[in-house]
Amino acid sequence: MKLIQKNIEKNGSGWITMCPEEPEDMWHLYNILQVGDQLKASTVRRVVKVGATGSTSGSRVVMKLRILVENMDFDTKAAQLHIKGRTTEYHPEVKMGSYHTLDLELHRNFTLYKNEWDAFALDRVDAACNPSRNAEIGAVVLDEGLANICLITDYMTILRQRIDQVIPRKRRGDSSAYQKGLDKFYDSVFQSINSEFDFDKLKVVILASPGFVARGLYDYIFSMAVKLDLKQIVKSKNKFVILHSSTGHIHSLNEILKDPAVESKLADTKYVQEIRVLNKFYDVMNEDDRKAWYGPNHVLKAFELGAIGELLISDSLFRSSDIATRKKWVSLVEGVKEINCPVYIFSSLHESGKQLDLLSGIAAILTYPVDEEDISEDEEDEESQNFEHS
């Protein structure tokens, strides 16, 4: 994302003009946008004009419209963002207050207006506009005839291509048809990664499969790279890591990225840090479940008790259309940061984020054990007081 201009008042209101430069930027915007914000962007509308004789003619006109955001839709596969709302600014070709859907496009500026730019939104803008942010992991998760070619960024796992081919079975005494089919499959995967991966920018390229399929692909890639004199691939040979996975499906990525061979190369990346702390949470919960809490009420109570050591929270919680709910999570994150405890904001588009969402989207590793009875008693006391007041 490119930051074009920024104007934030002391009370937190203001606007920011940005330009999305890659598909992941649309995911950032989806997390920044809220119902009630205003958005100004270029769009195309069909304008009908009536001539002097009563005849009509229509043409498609590019115009800038400003709308009050009522609804948002993010297409994860196409990485496209559609925002619906009523127009709030005069335009000679568009009736004020009419509904329109803005489809944000790459390399087209837009301006976002908010009554309050909270800490989460501003941090997300900073992350999106960080020039060092790029895809750092290329991954091929495969099995015989099936391959998922992925790019993994800090915030998204992008499935660039899925290859599904039928490979003939081995016949007793004759495996030529099988080998021919396997080589054809390997070649399809090779062509895909050659076009989808920028090997100069990637830190690591993972080939993972059950059995020896990944090893076979590795051998095929480098035999072809040498044969075709593809220097970019040849000089990136030390970036390739061959790993075992239980399946050839994309959900095996979490299991794959736990491997020490990958962790050592990607220790400083956001995605690997998220996987590591989520695994730590599960380990702590297995050892002493009084030191690992999840769920909104339990985590908020742990914060009140000053017991949070590490906070795990999904970005899905910040997409609440209820302003008070969003403020509650922003306040919690800021409060935990103020006591110098680490906060991990998981992307719900990563497998680790999806796992956290299954735990209600929020969890905490505590600095000391807290019995569930203590929290339950406090909740009962609060309910009793509320009943007495009512």
From Swiss-Prot:
Keywords: Cell cycle, Cell division, Cytoplasm, Meiosis, Metal-binding, Mitosis
Single GO term (MF): GTPase regulator activity
Domain of life: Eukaryota
GO-annotated biological processes: cell division; cytoplasmic translational termination; endoplasmic reticulum unfolded protein response; meiotic cell cycle; nonfunctional rRNA decay; nuclear-transcribed mRNA catabolic process, no-go decay; nuclear-transcribed mRNA catabolic process, non-stop decay; ribosome disassembly
Location in the cell: Cytoplasm
InterPro entries: eFR1_2_sf (IPR042226), eRF1_1_Pelota (IPR005140), eRF1_2 (IPR005141), eRF1_3 (IPR005142), Pelota/DOM34_N (IPR038069), Ribosomal_eL30-like_sf (IPR029064), Transl-rel_pelota (IPR004405)
Pfam families on file: eRF1_1 (PF03463), eRF1_2 (PF03464), eRF1_3 (PF03465)
One GO cellular component, as annotated: nucleus
Cofactor: a divalent metal cation
Family listed: Belongs to the eukaryotic release factor 1 family. Pelota subfamily.
UniProt subunit comment: Component of the Dom34-Hbs1 complex, also named Pelota-HBS1L complex, composed of dom34 and hbs1.
Protein role: Component of the Dom34-Hbs1 complex, a complex that recognizes stalled ribosomes and triggers the No-Go Decay (NGD) pathway. In the Dom34-Hbs1 complex, dom34 recognizes ribosomes stalled at the 3' end of an mRNA and engages stalled ribosomes by destabilizing mRNA in the mRNA channel. Following ribosome-binding, the Dom34-Hbs1 complex promotes the disassembly of stalled ribosomes, followed by degradation of damaged mRNAs as part of the NGD pathway.
NCBIfam families for this protein: pelota (TIGR00111)
Protein name stated in the entry: Protein dom34
